[in-house]
Amino acid sequence: MVNPRFSVNVDRVRAVSRALAGIGWDGFVRLDMLEPEFNVLSEVYHRVGDVRVLLVLGLSAAIVDYQLAGDAFRFWNTLQKVLAKRGFKLSSIGDIRAVMGEFLNYPVNARFNSTKRGRVAKFFNSGFADFLWDRAYKYYSDRPTEIWYGLAKTLGNRPDQKTIVFAMKVLDLISLLVNGSYANFPRDVPIPLDVHVARMALYSGIVKGDGSEISERVIQRNKEIFLRAWGDVAERVSEMLGRRISPLRIDSLVWQLSKEAQKASYRRNHAIRYIIRYLVDVANIDGNVAKNVAQELTYKMPY
């Protein structure tokens, strides 16, 4: 049941959307290219040059990118080390499955390891990897919804489950890497909702509620509210820019800036400085825009 203490704050959605629109299309693309998974996928593509490898490897890794003993950077950097150790030999589905088997032995994947192995086994044993390798690589960018719902069905998950949606973000980044444009996802594709993204919804004020209460249980009970709030932000930013800004783009921004806020122990004055510095120095965003984004995303954060 939805907790009545959590609700979408339309006024804050408007304010946050205005700030984020200042980032512009190119800014959102640069933020996507700073994602840890993009760096690894880019190296694989430049070494192997096969979109089939990117799809099978990227999606099979994405479905186990949760409950990490570390963070996403450690997860994807570890995968990169496994690939380098094998000389980036990735000429078949069997090669990729062997990589995933070795990757799951590493400490970053220690939590829920048997469950993760089961998910990877389903991915390969069900024929889904073969589907990507034999057919879907030809049209993954034009018809991503077929892959999205097919993956959810294969793993017995809802299409809006975090790891399923995150896998689609990986597909979207593969399309950007290979084609120079994003995949043709429908407007209702949700943001991959995790604790970081939910917490920033509360700290920005787009969701009314107490940030100290945030937990996986609270998120799941109020999932529709968090998804709607960020979805509304994406819609408004799209209207302001005159170009489609998917919630998957918003995710890159919010996730990266949540890590900066975390470094500042979620104290507003420090978080604002960290966020501005990151946006300006790392993402090459205008200083005034960065200041507006930092102030709006930390609006409800304690001092």
For each predicted feature, which ranges?
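HhH-family (HhH-GPD) DNA N-glycosylase catalytic core used in base-excision repair
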Residues: 1-303
